[in-house]
Amino acid sequence: MRIALCSYSQKEKETALLMKLGKVDRFDNGVFCVYAMQRDGPYDAVVVMEDGARGMNFCMSIRGYSRDVPLLWISDQAEFEPQSRRMQVDDFWVKPVTEYQLREAVSQLLQKTTRRNEPREEDE
């Protein structure tokens, strides 16, 4: 599984945790994440760990590229939750988030990817 971690700051602990779930690419700019998806195909999950307007900009860049890539936004500002719904973010969490919560949230996103990629009965 391929996971993108989008954050301006280094997230060593979170990166190490996500690496247990798949290959992690870290981006400090939403545009670079989109460029990587254009070049290499969509990620199985994208995790935005940036607060407020910066996090919203990451999400807008990613949603501008694809409405289908599973997207988790973690922010310290709960008031951005309505914007996350409007942008069709799959899951929005307010910090602090424990390692267990992060692992579970990303695992659920990856399960959505698996279900989306499974052939439907009518396709067979």
What role is predicted for each listed range?
Residues 11, 30-34, 39-66, 77-78:
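Conserved phosphotransfer microenvironments
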Residues 3-35:
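Two-component/phosphorelay signaling modules centered on CheY-like receiver
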Residues 97-106:
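C-terminal output helix
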Residues 63, 82-86:
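Alpha4-beta5-alpha5 "output face"
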Residues 107-121:
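The C-terminal output helix
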